[in-house]
């Protein structure tokens, strides 16, 4: 089963590749520039997938928009996660904003929305979340983005310390890609095998 996964983020591409292959998908990865003007993760994922429609034919086109929502910051950075600070030091800004927040109020969750534009231009979307807490300092050397300061519920190390094998079986991106792959297998690929 072949799909196109659209992203300009090399880290997302690597994760998507690791997740999609065991789910039975051969993926072509494509970088398409798209302004993220949506107010939600789903709107941005749709914009990204639709941006590739003119350059790809006859296969479903998937795109991801994801980020972290911190309860003590009223859900921010949210859709602004990748551009939360002006200088790219997103973790530093987040930790500074959380400096006086006690542990009990450091709850957060990652969100991943996947949009898929079908060859007939029909759009399908799914979303998933991964709950946890914001640490007081970065921990771990793996992952990317906010992984070093995100402690997933039920774990004693940050997402950056889990290792890619475990992270890619429990994360928000894994859950969303698994949901979308199941949807595509039941609908599109059952008719286009």
UniProtKB/Swiss-Prot annotation:
GO molecular function: dITP diphosphatase activity; ITP diphosphatase activity; metal ion binding; nucleotide binding; ribonucleoside triphosphate phosphatase activity; XTP diphosphatase activity
Any one of the GO CC terms: cytosol
EC number(s) on file: 3.6.1.66
GO BP term (any one): purine nucleoside triphosphate catabolic process
Entries under InterPro entries matching the protein: dITP/XTP_pyrophosphatase (IPR020922), ITPase-like_fam (IPR029001), RdgB/HAM1 (IPR002637)
Catalytic EC class: hydrolase
A Pfam family that the UniProt record links to this protein: Ham1p_like
Cofactor: Mg(2+)
Catalyzed reactions per annotation: XTP + H2O = XMP + diphosphate + H(+); dITP + H2O = dIMP + diphosphate + H(+); ITP + H2O = IMP + diphosphate + H(+)
Residues engaged in binding Mg(2+): 65
NCBIfam families: RdgB/HAM1 family non-canonical purine NTP pyrophosphatase
Family: Belongs to the HAM1 NTPase family.
Subunit and interaction comment: Homodimer.
UniProt-recorded name of the protein: dITP/XTP pyrophosphatase
Species of provenance: Tropheryma whipplei (strain Twist)
